[in-house]
């Protein structure tokens, strides 16, 4: 009996996760999204149904997967100091991979802008493109996103200091600013005089700003989950890795937007 008890005791600080179907199912839903997106760009009938089904399926998988992670961390106590250290390295590598992704699209933008092709009239922006003034909606969105970065840092410091109410308020403020940013970005797309298919400028502009907008939406969802967990007393002054990861991700979104504003809206309008 004693040998069984000793065998069951965990004598290492690492968390050996149980077999999970969520990685495989999530990759399958990502395949559905990719298929729906390709069919949509080729104007196939019913492609939007496939695309939105894949998005809904992926959101559902994210919900149940994060639910399992929260259970392992908050209720089972599996996220030791060593596990949290590994997760911090993981989110750093994830953000680094996101930086590489954005570099690829910015590379395409600078390649076309610094060496304009004959098809664009050897000028940049191409003739006929009525680009946005950087000091209208783009500048307003810059202020909004910087304020949201300050608000999420305020919330993080409040958690560390034990000021729970202030942490909840500042996190709600962050989410509100993120939603306002998204609304302004959608409005900017609606009034744009060019589209995704309008040459190199249209494709690079909408791909970069759209990719950033997608990350803003993901980050907003991330912060909303953190707000729910904060209300449910899941975070303490010492143990709040989930919130730290969301904060790092949101600051990454801020930095990308600053570079995007300077390179595409300001420098790209000359």
From Swiss-Prot:
It is found in: Mitochondrion inner membrane. SUPFAM superfamilies: Cytochrome c oxidase subunit III-like (SSF81452). The chain crosses the membrane at residues 21-41, 46-66, 90-110, 131-151, 167-187, 205-225, 248-268. It catalyses: 4 Fe(II)-[cytochrome c] + O2 + 8 H(+)(in) = 4 Fe(III)-[cytochrome c] + 2 H2O + 4 H(+)(out). It holds the Pfam family COX3. Signal peptide: none annotated. GO terms for molecular function: cytochrome-c oxidase activity. It comes from the Eukaryota. This is Cytochrome c oxidase subunit 3. It comes from Cyanidium caldarium. The gene is COX3.
